[in-house]
Amino acid sequence: MRGKQKLFAVMLGVVSVIAFISCRTRVETREHSKLETRNRFDEIHFPNQILWAWERPEELEFLDSQQFAVAFLAQTLVLKNDDVEYKPRRQPLKVKPDTRLIAVTRIESQKTTALPAALNATQKQKLIDLILKTAPLRNVSAIQIDFDAARSEREFYKTLLQELRQKLPDNIPLSMTALASFCIGDRWLDDLPVDEAVPMIFRMGTDSRTIKTFLTSGNDFREPLCRRSYGIALDEPLEINFDRSRRKYIFNVRPWTEKDLLALPQEVH
C-alpha cells in the first residue's frame, strides 16, 4: 500500500512539473510574441503627429509634411442585416503633394432596425474588399480601422483584422482605434495583427474620470499595442506625461486651421 502511495505521489509530482512548464511556456510565448510585434510605422519613419480629418472640407496645405501626417475618413461602412452599406467620403481634402496619409475606414452596426447585423463571412469579405481599395489611393501610406466592438462582435472584428492583414501589402501599417478602457484592463486586444491600437483618450463617457485619474497618477496602458500612440482631442486637454516617442492622433471638432496648431500642448510636439 505504501509503495502505491509513493508511486502516486511521484506521478502527481511529475504531472505538476509538466503542467507548470506548459503554463510557463504559454506565458513566455505570448510575451515573446508581443515583444516581436512589428511596428511598420517606425519602419517607414512615419511622422509622429497625425491630424484626424473627418467628414468635412479640410484645407491642410499649411502643414509641415515632415512633422505632420493626416488620417482622413475615406469611407463609412454600415453593417445592415446581412449587407454592407457603403458611404464614401464626399468632402474635399487638400494637402501638400508630399503629405503622408492614413486612409481611415469607419465601421458601424445598424442598430435602428429589429434585425441585428449578421456578422457573417459574406459581410466580412465585403468589408475587406472595400478597405483594400483605400490602400492604393494617392499618398496613402497606412490603413486605420475605426469601430466600436460590442462584446458579441469581437470575434468578428478579430478575424476581420487577421484576414485584412494577410491581404494588405506587407509594408503597409495597419492601425485600429480602441476604447481607452480596452487598453487598461481588457485582454481582447491580445495578439491582434495590428501595428498599433490607438487609445481614444477623449469622449470617454462614464469611464472618463477613472481613466484620466489612472493616467495622471503616472500609470500606463497595460496592453503593449496601446503603448505606441495616443488619441487625443484639441478641446480636451490632458494633464499627463506624454511619451514623446509615441504617435499622437489629434481630433478637432471643427476644420483645422494653422492657428489650431499653436493650441497643441507643448508635450504633443
Which residues fall in each region the model found?
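N-terminal Sec-pathway targeting helices
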Residues: 1-12
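Bacterial N-terminal signal peptides
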Residues: 11-19
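Boundary/entry segment of secreted carbohydrate-active catalytic domains
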Residues: 24-67, 73, 86-89, 99, ...
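Chitinase-like catalytic core of GlcNAc-active glycosidases
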Residues: 45-47, 80-194
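Active-site beta-loop-alpha junctions enriched in small/polar residues
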Residues: 52-56, 75, 106-110, 148-150, ...
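Conserved, mostly hydrophobic/aromatic
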Residues: 70, 145, 197
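Substrate-binding surface in catalytic domains of secreted glycosidases
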Residues: 165-233
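C-terminal active-site rim and adjoining tail of enzyme catalytic domains
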Residues: 208, 213-215, 219-269
